[in-house]
Amino acid sequence: MIIKKVMPKIPPAKKRVAAYCRVSTLRNEQDESFETQQKYYEELIQSHPDWELVKVYADRHSATRVKNRPGFQEMAAAAEAKKLDIIICKSISRFSRNMVDCQQYAKWFRTLGVTIIFEEQNIRTDDPTCDFVLSILAAVAQDE
């Protein structure tokens, strides 16, 4: 008689996904855009069965430097604590309008194993060709 060991199937772990959104002013007309962005990302992440929503991080600031944005800093701390796998952001300009910050943080997140997806530009930082394109688009975002 041959005894065969049957291993239970373990489903793959869900990707821990966060979103980052930002409006550049505190004016009332921006409130609707801000709330719409948050709702959109909650629904988008929940629509992927292999994704788990961690949080939608958000800032209502026009600060160009990420060190002045508490939502961004909270997201960075979560990444450093190994609580995130993917960050989704509408565009490079929402992530950072400062070219140096954009490139440094994109590389830093990647060293932590966190992929950033910039929706409008269709860029993923886990793509090895993204650095060149990201540097050009970050420069454009800085001049906007």
What are the roles of these predicted feature ranges?
Residues M1-E144:
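Short, structured surface patches at the beginning of a domain
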